[in-house]
Amino acid sequence: MLSTERIEFKEQSDPRADLHLLIKYPLGENGHKFVVIIPKGRDLVAVSSMTRVDGGQQDKMKEVMEEDSDEWKNWLHECRMQLIASGVDWGIHLGHSKSGRNGPLQAFNVSEPIWFDGLTKNELMQTIRRLWLSKLGLIHEIKFAFGKGNGKPGPVDDWENKKQSTQRIGSPSPPKPKQVHIDESMSFGDGFDPEDWI
């Protein structure tokens, strides 16, 4: 299905999935990586893509946060509104500080499920395209507001903290689960409180 559209893809080994593909879309050097997964025991295809924010752009965000916190809050609010208006599922990762998760935008994820009863080639391709345009919109917002950056991905505190919390000392790791377990930590709406947006 994907090869007829000249989309590059590579199958990944994943014991939690019946199928796990890494694809590049759109064609050409500006393509981004997307994941297409059929989780075991589910009647759906999950399509998603993660974007890390450039380290130089994160530094510029920190400057704006210090110089004009209202401008920063408004910019972040508008980004959230843009993601909501796109109609896709999304999650953002903000930098951590002593006072909480109020740092710069470090990464964001866009995703969308397609249930088998609605799965067609057209629906899969339109989903990938919709996710791409959602990503592209936020990427352009970041570049417009904070420049091109330094060309190197910046840190993502959530990922570092997750790595540290999964390391075990003194006891073996539990066996790998046979079913897909959903990580709700990146879901939008969990404990929804608009005050947390600031």
Model-derived regions: residue spans:
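Short, well-structured beta-strand
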Residues: 101-109, 128, 133-135
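Glycine-rich, often proline-containing surface loops adjacent to acidic residues and nearby aromatics
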Residues: 43-48, 102-116
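Short, internal acidic amphipathic alpha-helical interface segments
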Residues: 51-107
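Short, highly charged C-terminal tails/helix-capping segments
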Residues: 141-198
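Charge-rich, low-complexity N-terminal segments
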Residues: 1-46
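Short small-residue beta-strand/loop micro-motif enriched in glycine and branched aliphatics
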Residues: 45-47, 56-60, 119
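Ampiphathic alpha-helical segments that act as solvent-exposed interaction surfaces
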Residues: 66-87, 116-149
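Secondary-structure transition/turn motif
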Residues: 24-29, 48-55, 111-115
